Amino acid sequence: MHRHRSFRRGAQLFWDTRSEFCFYNETRECADALDQTKVAVKEGTCPVVLSDSGDNPTAGSSQDVRNFLKMIIADPVLSSLEPPLCYQAFYDPKLVEAAFKAGEGNTVNGTLGAAFDKIKSSPIPVNAKVKKLCKAWAGAQNSDMALLDVQGVDVVVTSKHVGCYDPEMMRALGVEPEKLKVIVVKLGYLEPEIRAIAKRSMLVLTDGSTNEIFTRLEYKELPRPMYPFDKDMSWQA
């Protein structure tokens, strides 16, 4: 009985303080995050590390939603940085296979994105230079990896679903992350390895199956009422 009372008190405490929960680090919508990134670059506060949090494979997303990448490519500042912005990483085994067939220094034609989840986004055509290849990298579950120049953005593409938090993934492809101005990782909160590099970091509220704003996800069998969908609901432990 004492244990049950403790559980009830804890549950009631969570409920009573629900409006106080928030992200613990800098969190922004996509367009705002890109604007702030350009401010940081201009001020020399680099590297800036952005978390593509809505498509976080370590939380169960598909690692192939390209919507945020498309915004970056369309930005004339962020798509022309030197050294280039590095985006780590997209799951697309067909594109990786094509990159290995083309070889380093050559051009690969194909599509990027929506290799697994064709609902959250759609593929974009790419005509990309193959900058570097890495076969069966042990740090990413022996995934093959390719570094592609996609319209001025260095994009890491993997043959397997992998966690995108380790800067060693970039180093395996010849990229020195400490020297970059902007890094984007498909991740939520930054892991210590990548956080140690960042001079400024932002969690970006991007699209995907791990969208941090739960009300933006589609639910088919959600019992109602349910918080935060029904803000005015009442509940008692």
Language-model segments: residues:
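Extended hydrophobic packing segments that form well-structured cores
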Residues: 15-18, 135-237
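Hard-cation-handling environments
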Residues: 1-152, 156-157
